[in-house]
């Protein structure tokens, strides 16, 4: 069982707080790599998480993803697209689909942002919030 908290930290910005580094990385891996993977076989494509793990492992001499990344961020709409074409392959997919349903019921216009962090009190949180505010707040963007 993955222990997490879900909190709307700013209007339309949702933080998924997962203390366990491995669980956090695995929960966010599929949508994050769908959003901005450097490998065109995964970015904006349906992919098996097992194919991604194999590719990442070969590229990095082992599957170090949970140790390489501590924070995650992407637009809600991207995660929705990702999970609309991806089949559930593990408990993390199942949980993330449930998180998306919860967020969908909270959004007014289907536009939002999701961040994945260990806590709401560290540099990673502040960094991920910069991405979220840039996306959701025109005053923050300066436009």
PLM regions with names:
Residues 1-112:
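A metal-dependent hydrolase signature that marks the N-terminal structural subdomain at the beginning
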Residues 22-23, 120-121, 139-140:
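Short, solvent-exposed loop/turn segments at secondary-structure junctions
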Residues 123-136:
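Active-site recognition of the HExxH zinc-binding catalytic motif
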Residues 135-143:
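Post-HExxH zinc-binding segment in Zn-dependent metallohydrolases
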């Amino acid at each position: 069982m993955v222990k997490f908290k879900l909190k709307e930290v700013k209007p339309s910005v949702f933080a998924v707080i997962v203390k366990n580094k491995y669980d956090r990385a695995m929960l966010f891996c599929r949508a994050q790599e769908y959003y901005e993977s450097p490998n065109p076989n995964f970015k904006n494509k349906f992919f098996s998480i097992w194919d991604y793990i194999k590719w990442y492992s070969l590229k990095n001499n082992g599957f170090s993803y949970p140790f390489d990344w501590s924070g995650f961020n992407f637009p809600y709409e991207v995660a929705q697209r990702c999970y609309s074409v991806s089949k559930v392959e593990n408990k993390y997919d199942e949980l993330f689909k449930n998180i998306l349903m919860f967020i969908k019921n909270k959004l007014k216009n289907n536009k939002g942002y999701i961040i994945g962090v260990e806590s709401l009190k560290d540099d990673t949180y502040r960094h991920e919030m910069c991405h979220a505010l840039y996306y959701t707040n025109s005053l923050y963007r300066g436009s």
